[in-house]
Amino acid sequence: SLDRNGMLTEVSGSDTTESQDLLSYCDMQRVARVIGAPDVLEYWKSAPYLLNFLDDYQLKDEVVKALNDPQQSLALRKILGAAPHLLLSQAAVAAGKAIPSHSPRLRGLLRDMTESGAWRLLWVPPTCPYYELQDAFAAPTMKGFTKRLVFSSWRVVPKVIASLVSYDAERHAR
């Protein structure tokens, strides 16, 4: 095509922000205020469970430092104690329980993977296969399933997607 986008189709997400999503933003913003960090909106829009996945980010380094500071530690622990949705539950992960995504985009991706059965596959079936597809690759629900391009300037995003999507696939496989 003239604009060189002939093979691309933009699909708008139909995922809505839920109250728990907003609550996680508000609580993460409270954490940021305690440590004197700026607004966390851009982080929050990009990934859930920021305190678990923000390795090598100044925000997480400041939170860790504040947890070791007697003056800030109490306020921070109070927020984290009242907001368990800010951190992944080790007990839930160990038990293989479903983990709330707290992110409309991630929730949509996980829903699409579950509904289509794509969690059973190591890769997306080819669009124009050389051979007849079999088993899970031939499932009617896989006909419309497509690869997703995810763009983000944050390094945390691929880590969150890989971790939580892999966990969800393993959970379904059990």
Predicted regions and their residues:
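Helicase motor interdomain insertion/brace
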Residues: 1-174
